[in-house]
């Protein structure tokens, strides 16, 4: 009985080693190398998502580093910004991509997206008191509520300089025009 128990225990340990990949006498060295060389899970679509996440994280870090910077009409940074100067400066610093000089130019030249498609790093556009129904203000999306589609954004405000606002704030809720994505 003891012998049978010992044999059964040894077989179980042997099987657990095979299941963990420790021992497999039938596996040829070529198969083992092919298995080791298969890094598709690293370099496949997931890797692209990781790169996009890192780019967005760096973009937002650059944007946040300017919180509190004063507003000045026509200023392109880094000591002062207007709204489009802020967005173009942040994108130029982090991606070396020119997204347009004015809020209207940025709205016209970048890829349109719906509010439901908003992601961190997208540009959001609003009218301004002087622009009538036309685009007159721009910011960069910080966060989006997928249920309500409300979002927070960082922008250069005429009264407060670079700050974070919410799309539900009374000054922005009715002025939203649309959103654009920067193709990197």
Language-model regions: role of each:
Residues 4-7, 18-34, 38-39, 48, ...:
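Aromatic- and glycine-rich peptidoglycan recognition patches
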Residues 11, 78, 106, 160, ...:
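Residue-level detector of flexible, active-site-proximal loop/helix-junction positions
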Residues 14-16:
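N-terminal signal peptide c-region/cleavage motif recognized by signal peptidases
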Residues 30-61, 65, 72, 76:
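N-terminal targeting signals for Sec/Tat export/insertion, comprising classic cleavable signal peptides
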Residues 49, 69-120:
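Catalytic cysteine-centered active-site loop
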């Amino acid at each position: 009985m003891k012998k049978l128990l010992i044999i059964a225990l040894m077989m179980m340990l042997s099987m657990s080693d095979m299941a963990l990949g420790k021992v497999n006498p039938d596996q040829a060295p070529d198969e083992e190398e092919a298995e080791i060389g298969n890094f598709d899970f690293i370099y496949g679509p997931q890797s692209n998502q990781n790169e996009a996440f890192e780019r967005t994280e760096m973009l937002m870090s650059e944007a946040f580093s300017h919180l509190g910077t004063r507003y000045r009409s026509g200023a392109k940074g880094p000591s002062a910004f207007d709204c489009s100067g802020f967005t173009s400066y942040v994108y130029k610093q982090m991606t070396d991509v020119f997204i347009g000089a004015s809020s209207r130019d940025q709205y016209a030249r970048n890829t349109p997206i719906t509010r439901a498609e908003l992601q961190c790093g997208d540009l959001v556009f609003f009218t301004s008191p002087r622009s009538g129904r036309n685009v007159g203000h721009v910011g960069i999306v910080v966060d989006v509520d997928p249920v309500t589609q409300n979002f927070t954004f960082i922008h250069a405000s005429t009264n407060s300089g670079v700050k974070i606002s919410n799309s539900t704030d009374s000054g922005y809720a009715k002025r939203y025009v649309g959103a654009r994505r920067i193709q990197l």
